[in-house]
Amino acid sequence: MTIVAEVEIPAGFVPQYAMAFGAVDAPAVAVHDGNPLPVRLLKKPAGSVPLAGSLGASGLAGPFLPELDRPIWVTLSGDWSGTVDLLRSVDGGVTKFPLTAGGARWARFTANANEAAAEESEVGASYYLFATLTGGTLTYRVAQ
């Protein structure tokens, strides 16, 4: 929509119909696609509490309660063998499902790792680590 304003006597100016900005003692410039506001979004550090610990035998760790729209990082370290799965729940942990991508298992680890495994968009979802260890001690951290 184009807004046309006419200069009428006795005024020698036309009020802006849109936001404008400018430097001190400089003319104001209208905001438009070619001249956006000089701002950038700042994201504060995540407020979610990391899930961290170690397992010397098979077991379940969790829950991790993520903030929305942030990557969920899984860090696994130590001298361990077995498999570790990142599980997701939307009912407070009553049921937990493995992550999948295109129907194939996702976020299943058999070695030390440090990677973004998921990003959450549903309020109330929680994450768990399920380890099936055949030896050693696993040190884990799930965080944002």
Task: For each feature predicted by the language model, list its residue ranges.
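Hydrophobic beta-strand segments within beta-rich accessory/binding domains
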Residues: 66-79, 85, 127-132
